[in-house]
């Protein structure tokens, strides 16, 4: 018999028929439609009827419907929803710090994860400007006249966010020569005043850094040992440079050394730190700065790994807030040029003045890189201290309940 020997069932194999899409055997259709039995459904849970009908075009109410006003409203509403989520995360983190739950180091992971979430949201908000920029200046001008006197400066949630993170009130740029709170009335003004009186994230982080293990003068005494090591290291560096033959290169190295010496030794001048603090050029207390630098230097130690992640997240948030302000400035400049804003401000010129270190909260963390030193200058740990930094601290033998930790 000629032909393919594999045809038929010559080898005694049993071939199973594969299920055909749409047949009774299609597993993709074996679920149960529970919504058909009543109860909470998607639209009701999210209150979509309210959310999706909250776009009232002012141009349309004035009888001149402008297409791009819808995009303008949607984008700003999305911003406000994300601001609400950021405030939700920020308030929860502040509560953990305020209630002392952060003393149980197991809660630090929760703090870090929530602050990281805030930074991821801010990344999205920075990118969101690109959607608004699909609208041209002429498109915006078509409906801009209908917006006055509404202004982005009147965003209550953004001002609350600034206050709760820790933007210093005396560092704010006046808005038309008036206090920023003068633009808010009634309950909104009271909420802002209350947020100014509450503990900020900056203050809570500062108190936490002041408790950094290893700062104790009668313990590891990190600061005392660091000063001693830096002083000795600078002396050795100066001797090395002086041993070189006279040359232009040597003169440059001596000049560079003197600058480095001045910067590093300024670390141990507490009066200078207090002076810079009073001017607003530094934000953290002297002891908190010591704690931050210790975490920075020993970030690879198990006990400092999560705290270092928190410091990194705080810097990310500060950077992203600055990027958000900068992108906002660029967009306003593109849309308005140098015209006044709809709320009466100087527009681009006012916004440009807010893109500076005046509005940075954790500027001291960025400046830690100023004090980088060779690794062999960092104080070595004895076995006892090294073991200590392998041990986390906790308040009791069990995790907090959801009521306490949420």
Swiss-Prot record:
GO molecular function: amino acid binding; heme binding; identical protein binding; metal ion binding; oxygen binding; tryptophan 2,3-dioxygenase activity
Effect of residue 42 to A: Reduces enzyme activity by 99%
EC number: 1.13.11.11
Annotated effect of mutating residue 108 to I: In HYPTRP; reduced tryptophan 2,3-dioxygenase activity; does not affect homotetramerization
GO biological process, one term: L-tryptophan catabolic process to kynurenine
Keywords, sorted A to Z: Dioxygenase, Disease variant, Heme, Iron, Metal-binding, Oxidoreductase, Tryptophan catabolism
Pfam families hit by this protein: Trp_dioxygenase (PF03301)
Binding sites annotated in the UniProt record for substrate: 72-76, 144, 342
Effect noted on mutating residue 144 to A: Reduces enzyme activity by 99%
Pathway listed: Amino-acid degradation; L-tryptophan degradation via kynurenine pathway; L-kynurenine from L-tryptophan: step 1/2
Reported impact of residue 76 to A: Abolishes enzyme activity
Gene Ontology CC terms: cytosol
Cofactor detail note: Binds 1 heme group per subunit.
Binding site for heme: 328
Effect ascribed to mutating residue 45 to A: Reduces enzyme activity by 99%
Cofactors: heme
Xref: SUPFAM superfamilies: Indolic compounds 2,3-dioxygenase-like
Keyword Oxidoreductase appears in the UniProt entry: yes
Catalytic activity: L-tryptophan + O2 = N-formyl-L-kynurenine
Enzyme class: oxidoreductase
Family in the record: Belongs to the tryptophan 2,3-dioxygenase family.
UniProt xrefs under PANTHER family: TRYPTOPHAN 2,3-DIOXYGENASE
Subunit architecture: Homotetramer. Dimer of dimers.
Associated clinical condition: Hypertryptophanemia: An autosomal recessive condition characterized by persistent hypertryptophanemia and hyperserotoninemia.
Name of the protein: Tryptophan 2,3-dioxygenase
Lineage start: Eukaryota, Metazoa, Chordata, Craniata, Vertebrata
């Amino acid at each position: 018999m000629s032909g393919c020997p594999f045809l038929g069932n010559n080898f005694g194999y049993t071939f199973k028929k594969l299920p055909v899409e749409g047949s009774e055997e299609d597993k993709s259709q074996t679920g149960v439609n529970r919504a058909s039995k009543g109860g909470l459904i998607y639209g009701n849970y999210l209150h979509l009827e309210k959310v999706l009908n909250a776009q009232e075009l002012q141009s349309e109410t004035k009888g001149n419907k402008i297409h791009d006003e819808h995009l303008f409203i949607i984008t700003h509403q999305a911003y406000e929803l994300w601001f609400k989520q950021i405030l939700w995360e920020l308030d929860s983190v502040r509560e953990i710090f305020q209630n002392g739950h952060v003393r149980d180091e197991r809660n630090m992971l929760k703090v870090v994860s929530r602050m990281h979430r805030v930074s991821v949201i801010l990344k999205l908000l920075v990118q969101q400007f690109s959607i608004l920029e699909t609208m041209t200046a002429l498109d915006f001008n078509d409906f801009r006249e209908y917006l006055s006197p509404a202004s982005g400066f009147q965003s209550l949630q953004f001002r609350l966010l600034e206050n709760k993170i820790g933007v210093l009130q005396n560092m704010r740029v006046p808005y038309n020569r008036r206090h920023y709170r003068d633009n808010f009335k009634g309950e909104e003004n009271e909420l802002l005043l209350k947020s100014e009186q509450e503990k900020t994230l900056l203050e809570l982080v500062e108190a936490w850094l002041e408790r950094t293990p290893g700062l104790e003068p009668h313990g590891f005494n990190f600061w005392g040992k660091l000063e001693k090591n830096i002083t000795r290291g600078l002396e050795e560096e100066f001797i090395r440079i002086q041993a070189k033959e006279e040359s232009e290169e040597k003169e440059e190295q001596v000049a560079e050394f003197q600058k480095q010496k001045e910067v590093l030794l300024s670390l141990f001048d507490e009066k200078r730190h207090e002076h810079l603090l009073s001017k607003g050029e530094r934000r953290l207390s002297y002891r908190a700065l010591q704690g931050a630098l210790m975490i920075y230097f020993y970030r690879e130690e198990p006990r400092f790994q999560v705290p270092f992640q928190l410091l990194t997240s705080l810097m990310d948030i500060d950077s992203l807030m600055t990027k958000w302000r900068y992108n906002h400035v660029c967009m306003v400049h593109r849309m308005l040029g140098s015209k006044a804003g709809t709320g009466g401000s100087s527009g681009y010129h006012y916004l440009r003045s807010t893109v500076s270190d005046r509005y940075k909260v954790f500027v001291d963390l960025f400046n830690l890189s100023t004090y980088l030193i060779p690794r062999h200058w960092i104080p070595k740990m004895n076995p006892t201290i090294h073991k200590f930094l392998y041990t986390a601290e906790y308040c009791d033998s069990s995790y907090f309940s959801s009521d306490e930790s949420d």
